[in-house]
């Protein structure tokens, strides 16, 4: 979506609460009385040194429901409340579903959440705890989306990648990164990449900051996919997706397609970024290595550490400002017994 706004003054921002709503002018909700919030946003940006590189971890997994999804959900459900909608349907691999269930509970909106049957039990339990109706689909992530779309013919479809309000909320991560770095853009931003919501939102946010003269360059945006399910990598590398993909422990990014595929690839290309793939073994090692640094994240988030190692082989990262998003809590993941 496109709307005009003037980014808030830096001195004014210092007076505002540390949530996504500090950037109120940039969020397309007409009235404050419709805002649905758990004070999400302004997640910690933690300086670390990894393999001789100074970098920052953006701890999105400390959000109210344990994932980056809360940013987009706050704006999406605020808009739903503003429109007077009382029932919604949503599909998810788990994190977005849990987030939507929580914010719908706060807004007193009835939610029906579709997830793959093989989704983590912890995520499914979280959705049910908030009072949403959980519908399990025996199929992959794309089949789950189709089932939700069929069910949403007579109600509101609150899907994260389709809905522009979700993107508008998630773009605030870009704003925070720049503000937390002293109003300077990083050189690289890395995040897990599934359906592409985070990548698209980062692109939107950084582009708005550049267009308003707040930063003078776009960071290189790097998406990390699981080798077993990597349609964006294949398209970025060769121009073609495979006909079929396998399963991955990183369930949150197990998407074989995206409804905004070309738009998301364009974000990577515009930023002169790239897409990286990592193996299942590398993901397991990433979980352990991150936990030994004090970061307890789910497998979907852990792809970024081996992704960083691979990026180092192809780019000179010395003296570069690197920000890496840790997007989902390890508490959401059920380890196989």
Where are these regions (language model features)?
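PLP-dependent amino-acid enzyme catalytic core
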Residues: 1-337
């Amino acid at each position: 979506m496109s709307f005009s706004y003037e980014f808030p003054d830096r001195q004014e921002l210092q007076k505002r609460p540390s949530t996504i709503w500090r950037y109120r002018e940039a969020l397309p909700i007409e009235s404050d009385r419709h805002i649905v919030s758990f004070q999400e946003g302004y997640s910690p940006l933690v300086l670390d040194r990894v393999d001789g590189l100074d970098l920052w971890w953006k701890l999105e997994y400390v959000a109210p429901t344990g994932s980056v999804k809360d940013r987009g959900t706050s704006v999406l459900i605020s808009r739903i409340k503003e429109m007077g909608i009382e029932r919604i349907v949503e599909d998810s691999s788990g994190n977005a579903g849990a987030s939507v269930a929580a914010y719908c509970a706060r807004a007193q909106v009835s939610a029906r959440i579709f997830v793959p049957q093989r989704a983590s039990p912890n995520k499914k339990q979280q959705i049910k705890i908030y009072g949403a109706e959980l519908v399990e689909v025996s199929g992959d992530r794309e089949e789950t989306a189709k089932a939700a779309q069929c069910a949403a013919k007579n109600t509101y479809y609150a899907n994260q990648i389709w809905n522009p309000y979700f993107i508008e909320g998630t773009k605030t991560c870009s704003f925070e990164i720049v503000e937390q770095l002293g109003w300077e853009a990083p050189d690289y931003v890395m995040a897990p990449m599934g359906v592409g919501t985070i990548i698209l939102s980062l692109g939107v946010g950084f582009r708005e900051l550049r267009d308003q003269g707040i930063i003078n360059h776009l960071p290189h945006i790097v998406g990390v996919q699981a080798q077993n399910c990597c349609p964006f990598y294949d398209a970025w590398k060769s121009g073609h997706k495979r006909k079929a993909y396998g399963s991955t422990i990183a369930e949150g990014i197990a998407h074989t397609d995206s409804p905004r595929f070309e738009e998301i690839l364009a974000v990577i290309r515009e930023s002169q970024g790239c897409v990286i793939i990592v193996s299942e073994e590398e993901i397991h090692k990433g979980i352990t290595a991150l936990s030994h640094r004090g970061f307890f994240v789910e497998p979907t988030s852990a792809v970024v550490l081996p992704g960083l190692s691979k990026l180092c082989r192809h780019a000179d990262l010395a003296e570069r400002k690197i920000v890496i998003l840790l997007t989902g809590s390890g508490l959401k993941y059920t380890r196989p017994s």
